[in-house]
Each structure stands twice: as C-alpha cells, then as structure tokens.
C-alpha cells in the first residue's frame, strides 16, 4: 500500500525531534529549512495564560525550522494535537530546505492571537532544544529568545 506524504514545516516545539516523533509516529525525511518573509511571535494563548509559537508575515524576516516529510495520516494526527481549526489553522507555504529547491509545506498559524504573552520556560526550552539539535543559526536562536522575552 502506497501512502501519500506531505511536507510539514515546524518552527516551534515540533522542531524537537523526540516530540515530533511522539506526535507524528514516523518521520520519513527531515531537513533544516527556511521560510522567507515571516517571523516567529509568541502570541498564541495556551493553557495557563502562557504563549505558544506562531508565525506572521514580516517582509525581510526569515523563519528557520525543520521540514519533515510525513504521511498524511500523521499530518491529521498533528492537526488533532494542535487543535485545528479552533486553535490553529493549517496553510500551505513555500519553504526552502538547506541546499535544495523550494517545496510546498504545511504549517500552522494561530487562529486567534493576543499581545503581551510569554511562553512557559519548559515550552521555550523545547523550542531551543529543537533548534540546537538541528544546528539552526545561533543568530536565529538569539532571535527566538528575544521574541520570547527571554534574551
């Protein structure tokens, strides 16, 4: 049986490989990648009044993250975990893997945003661990800390 696959671009805690495996079950491929003209914001309200990661358009900025190739069923599992459509909506964007050609990928964008939020220390650490695990640029990791109010 030949399952259909999809590319998913992770920019938050799903960059953490162990977490992504626990949610998707299986990763077929993974690559560092970038999404131009967007930036990460911590403006998605989650339980406890803390912030979840979100992205929004921002000319000249770049979001670095991890591009995962997964089966469609795994994407549906992620949708359930992320709370689509109540908490996040899934859209398609064009991302560029390191050293590769641009590909269409699925991402999550917060359905509702709120200003003045900060991520919990554990959540931020999961993001930073994933960024470090994939050797994302140190300057970008600094941008994540600044966006989280932790710099």
Place the predicted regions along the sequence by residue.
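Glycine-aromatic micro-motifs
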Residues: 1-151
């Amino acid at each position: 049986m030949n399952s259909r696959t999809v590319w998913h671009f992770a920019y938050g805690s799903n960059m953490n490989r162990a977490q992504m495996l626990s949610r998707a079950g299986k990763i077929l491929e993974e690559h560092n990648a970038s999404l131009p003209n967007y930036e990460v914001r911590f403006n998605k309200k989650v339980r406890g009044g803390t912030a979840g990661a979100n992205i929004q358009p921002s000319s000249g900025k770049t979001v670095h993250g991890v591009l995962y190739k997964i089966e469609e069923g795994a994407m549906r599992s992620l949708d359930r975990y992320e709370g689509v459509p109540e908490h996040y909506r899934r859209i398609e964007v064009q991302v560029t893997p390191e050293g590769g050609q641009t590909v269409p990928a699925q991402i999550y964008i917060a359905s509702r945003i709120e200003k003045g939020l900060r991520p919990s220390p554990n959540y931020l650490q999961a993001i930073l661990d994933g960024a470090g695990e994939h050797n994302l640029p140190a300057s970008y990791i600094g941008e994540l800390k600044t966006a989280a109010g932790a710099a």
